[in-house]
């Protein structure tokens, strides 16, 4: 068994296609097939079910691939430990970010990070929280930026900033004339929310925890869609503070502060406990903090944070 063979089964699991996996690994398809077959013979089990199209891992194959991913991660960590001792920031960084942060953070972050750390190859994926946690556990990604706390003992959270929620209300709503709103002012019957899988959806419902959860006519896939729905259909939605910069001047008139209590979410960079690239972690954290308004870095806002 070699590290190369483990890389091959990881690639095949990712692509579910022998030719594409071979291209990903930079070898010929017959070589890839032969090396995977050799590994299966050595382990005396089938890692992939070749009768299916596209091919799929067998039940034991999934377990082997998960272990291969962890071994691959720790091998990279070994190289990174050496680089850390040399005080050089290089290599590849696989970073994930949730969709309700990405639109306003990513454009500036990517530009700034590439300029400051040209020797790091940055790969960014936009994923939901549950997918991020799964990928972090098996070391498919190195770190992520998302809403916390996760309360997962295997994941280390490093808080970056605290973001308030705002109510975005149609001018046709009875509550539109109020300058501030509390949870009791906002009827769930008129609330538009994100679809299942978004942590922001859970936070909105937790904020309105004293009310009965309703079945929305439509659950949107993005905050932009929610805003357009409110503009045309009425009702209201809840949006993160940083999304305000993406609104036009007319839309900004529809915003209201939420009080008693304030609604805030904690945004953190999260890593596995065995992550050794401290320099890269600090690079990401510092880069984000340079983008975020200074008042959102105040840790005293944590007391208003809503649980997921």
Where are these regions (language model features)?
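Secondary-structure junction motif
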Residues: 176-177, 189-211, 277-286, 291-305
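A short LG(V/I)-centered, amphipathic sequence patch enriched
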Residues: 40-59
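Flexible hinge/capping segments at coil-to-helix
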Residues: 152-191
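Short helix-boundary/capping micro-motifs
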Residues: 10-28, 52
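Residues within helix-turn-helix
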Residues: 18-23, 30, 37, 133, ...
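Hydrophobic hinge/microswitch elements
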Residues: 128-141, 146-147, 197-256, 301, ...
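A late-sequence structural motif
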Residues: 105, 171, 254-297
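Central regulatory/effector-binding core of bacterial HTH transcription factors
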Residues: 90-153, 220-222
């Amino acid at each position: 068994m070699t590290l190369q063979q483990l890389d091959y089964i990881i690639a095949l699991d990712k692509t579910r296609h022998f030719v594409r996996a071979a291209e990903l690994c930079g070898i010929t398809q017959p070589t890839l097939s032969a090396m995977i077959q050799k590994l299966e013979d050595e382990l005396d089990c089938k890692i992939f079910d070749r009768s299916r199209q596209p091919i799929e891992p067998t039940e034991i194959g999934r377990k082997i691939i998960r272990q291969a991913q962890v071994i691959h991660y720790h091998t990279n960590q070994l190289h990174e430990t050496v680089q850390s001792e040399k005080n050089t920031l290089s290599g590849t960084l696989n970073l994930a970010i949730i969709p309700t942060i990405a639109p306003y953070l990513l454009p500036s972050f990517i530009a700034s990070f590439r300029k400051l750390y040209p020797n790091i190859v940055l790969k960014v994926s936009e994923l939901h929280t549950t997918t991020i946690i799964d990928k972090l556990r098996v070391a498919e990604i190195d770190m992520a930026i998302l809403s916390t706390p996760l309360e997962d003992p295997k994941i280390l959270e490093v808080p970056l900033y605290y973001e308030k929620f705002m109510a975005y209300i149609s001018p046709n709503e009875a509550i539109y004339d109020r300058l501030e709103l509390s949870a009791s002012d906002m009827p769930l019957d008129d609330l538009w929310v994100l679809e299942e899988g978004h942590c922001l959806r859970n936070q909105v419902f937790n904020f309105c925890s004293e009310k009965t959860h309703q079945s929305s006519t439509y659950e949107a896939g993005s905050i932009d869609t929610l805003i357009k729905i409110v503009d045309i259909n009425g009702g209201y939605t809840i949006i993160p503070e940083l999304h305000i910069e993406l609104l036009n001047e007319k839309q900004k008139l529809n915003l209201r502060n939420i009080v008693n209590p304030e609604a805030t979410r904690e945004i953190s960079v999260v890593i596995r406990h065995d992550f050794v690239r401290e320099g890269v972690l600090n690079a990401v954290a510092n880069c984000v903090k340079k983008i975020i308004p200074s008042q959102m870095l105040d840790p005293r806002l944590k007391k208003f944070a809503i649980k997921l």
